[in-house]
């Protein structure tokens, strides 16, 4: 439990994203099929890309996604993440300091 639990109307899920079965986890916690915001920032950025590939975009949609890829580190995470998100209908709205991409879905 946390200090904001009584004020929150959505679940707080804490765990190791590298091991999570997102479809099962989201279903267990009654995550809506359309989620307002997803933020992804794991270390190293190659792990963030691995986790991104496991998000069930075929079932869940996010209005806004911020995805930290640390492009300035030249780890090869920028293009694969962009291709994956664009394949699922996300539009790259903004890149911040060659470090983070902001995506939106305009069809929701």
What are the residue ranges of the model-derived segments?
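Conserved acidic-Pro-Pro-aromatic motif
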Residues: 25-27, 31-108
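Glycine-rich adenosyl-binding loop in Rossmann-like folds that engage adenosine-containing cofactors
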Residues: 1-33
